[in-house]
Each structure stands twice: as C-alpha cells, then as structure tokens.
Amino acid sequence: MTILPSPVSRLSISSRVAILLAFQVLIGPSAHSQAAPPPSQLTKEQIVQRIDQAVQQRTDGISGYTVQEQYDLYRNSDPTPAAQETIKTTYTRAVGKDYTPIAQSGSSLLRSTVIDHVLAGEKELNLAANREGTLITSKNYEITPQPGTAEVNGRQCVLVTLKPLRKSPHLFNGKMWVDSTDFTIVRLQGTPSQSPSVFAGQATVARDYAKVDGFAMATHAEAHSHTFLFGETTLKIDYTNYKIDRDPTASH
C-alpha cells in the first residue's frame, strides 16, 4: 500500500474486516446432521468430519432466505450509536446477497464508509464463485477439537480452535463452539489471519447462532477494533425475521 488512508478510511478498513469475518460464516453449519455418539466417544478426526458434514448439509439444504439486519456503529464509550442502518437482506444460492434499505440515521459519512462498505464486501464474498473458500471446513482450516464440553447459550457444546490453512483477510484465527449432538455452530470468536493494511487496527469478532427452521443462523454479532485516531469502535448487528427457503432436492 503506497497511500496512507484517511482517518475515515482507517476506521472503514478495521470495522469492515472485522464484521466481514463474522458475516462470511453465515454460510455455516446446519442443524440437519444425524444424531452422533457423545463427543467423548468420537476421535478428533470424527468430530472434524461431523463439522464438515454439517456445513455441507446446510449449504445443500438452503436455497435462499431473507432476514432483517440492524447495524449500530459506536465510537469509544459513547452509548449512542454514531450511525445506524436497517436493511433487508435477500440471499439466493445461485446469485448471492442483495440489500434493500429500510431505515438510516446518524452520520451519513460513517454509514457510507463503514456500514455500506461492509455490505458491499459481504456481497462479494457471497458470490457463488467465492463462497466455498470462506466456509469453516477442513478445506480452509486446521480444526482442532478440545477436550470435554461446555454450555453455551443453553446448549452443550464442543470447543474447537480454528487456524486458517492460508493467509487471507477473509479467514481468521479463533474458536468455534458447536452443538455436541449435531455439530452445528453455536458461537464464533476470532481475529483476521491477515490484516489488509499496516494502518488498520486489530479487529475481533464474536457471533452467536440459533436454530431457525432447523438451520443454524446468525442472531447477533459484534466487531471491535481500535485505531490510533478514533480509539475503540464497535459495530453491532442483530438478525431477525428470518424466512428460509429449503432446497426440496436436498437429503436430510
């Protein structure tokens, strides 16, 4: 990079990368895996295999969906969002994502340079040609199950660590909690495996999932970053009103 980004560009890059990491795993595991033996009876290789199967079943099972997404961007310790945007997202497997704005408030500059930039990047990531390379599977990550189980959001989960097999701002180092019975994603935490710019602050992501019509879908995400001039920035996203179109040809 030869041109030093403006302050707004720095904020845009940090927030964009963080939330893109959260968004890209929306195409995550499903809740249609067959019942499995307790994790204690499975080898690490078998657990990874079950996670891969759950991801594939979700990819095959959902032909499309719509969801309402609420974006709230915060600066430092200010309890009032500096910018907000509500959108309706329409996803189809063949095409990817499309957005319909519902409401906007706060700084138009921050919306255009951060939130709208994030949405544009997410749209690119969800193109059919790009989607396979962002899935949380053993093709893209070294997945290492940890011993035992833990309760997360009222569900018994297996914790696995994630290490990308290649450097990419679209992949991340982190942790994932999967349901111990069907190996669908429950929670994700991570940081980019590669910063897009030496000027961008470190970004971290946390994202929660719940079963909607039998599939694991994102319900809440938070991306935190820090820049020299802007300090702490947080982008919060809430997902509601899912309507899922199942693929009738998919096996369950």
How does the language model describe each region?
Residues 188, 219-221:
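Beta-strand-dense domains in secreted/periplasmic systems and polymorphic toxin scaffolds
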Residues 34-173, 180-185, 193-203, 210, ...:
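Structured extracytoplasmic
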Residues 3-4, 31, 90:
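N-terminal compositionally biased, intrinsically disordered segments and leader/signal-like regions
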Residues 16-28:
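Bacterial N-terminal signal peptides
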Residues 1-14:
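N-terminal secretory signal peptides that target proteins for export/translocation
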